[in-house]
Amino acid sequence: MRPILLPDPPSLSTGVPDIFEQGGSHNVVRRAVVIGNGFPGSENQCIGLVRALGLSDNHLLYRVTRPKGGLNEWLHWLPVGFHKKLDFILRHIYLYSRLMLGSKQSKYISSVPSENGGNVGLASILEADVKGIVNLARQTYEKDGPLIVIACGRDTISIASSIRRLASENVFVVQIQHPRSHLNRFDMVITPRHDYYPLTLEAQEQVPRFMRSWITPREPPQDHVVLTTGALHQIDYASLRKAASAWHDEFAALPKPLVVVNIGWPRSNCRYGADLAKQLTDSLLNVLATCGSVRITLSYKTPAKVSRVIFKELGDNPKVYIWNGQEPNPYMGHLAWGDAFVVTADSVSLISEACSTGKPVYVVGADHCKWKIAEFQKSLRERGVVRSFTGFEDMSESWSYPPLNDTAEAATRIRRELAARGWSLRS
């Protein structure tokens, strides 16, 4: 079988050197700064947007990281700045107690070994430095043009907003995911449409009246808010074509149709356990006759009680391959070569990426979801992008839909806003 050939992404090049772009070279955006929080799901959205803007070869990644170990695992609800100060105090108390008590270890606070055998403290944390990024934007503006700053996640909000406040003439700051309040701190906010579900009458009826003022967001989206259907990501024509080539030898000979199953993990708004795992395996066994082969991947956060059921029910089936986490991750190969996808309802990212292929996507466990995640599932079903996985499907049946294209659409909106400033992205 020949490798899958996907069309090249449309070229945006005009063939005009940067220096001749509108406004001169200092108005051409050539680089980006990504501010991440250390979580792949958040940073993947930033990198995907950088890629869609054509800046993947010229960006810097900064991270806002929290102290870890001991009591710190219970303090992630605190603002990151206060958390670090508290960690500093606790560590000094701990060190003082060790001096006073000799080698006797504290029962409540433990020192955390790092990879090189040292201890994790404030000095070893790679920080997103507001002052450093602001100086970079200001001092290199005339030579290298404006700086796009893209951040995602709650811990990055204060960093990104401070950069815009201090260098508004030199930067364009994009915050991915709803920052909950004071959206005017950013040049653009990109967030899923279901983040505004709390404003609907249906949602209001689910919340006691005395709590409604605490639920965010509290007002409709402003003009600089870009609403997406799902999550941003790095999946595009070029990445799928590259993956199709890279995984050709492993996947080309597999019996068709190739059904890919992606399993996430329970969330606060989508709880499940072994019961859903058993429902999934029963349904897969039901449709196995119409499958050529089945390949399953589990997240590193998938609960053991879920993975045990998957391995017990399907581990010995000759048609089924379950990724064990030890071999190279086949996820991109699955997206490129899969003929249909079955995805657990909890993960907006996994579903969004599968729905960017235009291939059949079936969702299992949507009835376990509530609040915003349930609204996300509903919107996809209404658009005909996903179907519920019942176990009575003919998996050889092919159907399609206009693929989700949120990342490219968000990038187009950024280009428009830059143009309104007299700025442009490099060709």
Swiss-Prot record:
Domain of life (superkingdom): Eukaryota
Disruption phenotype: Reduced plant growth and early bolting. Elongated mitochondria and reduction of the number of mitochondria per cell.
Any one Gene Ontology BP term: mitochondrial fission
Keywords associated with the record: Membrane, Mitochondrion, Mitochondrion outer membrane
Name of one Pfam family that matches: Mito_fiss_Elm1
Subcellular location, record wording: Mitochondrion outer membrane
CC annotations in GO: cytosol; mitochondrial outer membrane
SUPFAM superfamilies: UDP-Glycosyltransferase/glycogen phosphorylase
Membrane topology: Peripheral membrane protein
InterPro entries found in the cross-reference section: Elm1-like
Subunit record text: Interacts with DRP3 and DRP3B.
Biological role stated in the UniProt entry: Plant-specific factor involved in mitochondria fission. Is required for the correct localization of DRP3A from the cytosol to mitochondrial fission sites. Does not seem to be required for peroxisomal division.
Name used for this protein in its record: Mitochondrial fission protein ELM1
Species assigned in the record: Arabidopsis thaliana (Mouse-ear cress)
Name of the gene: ELM1
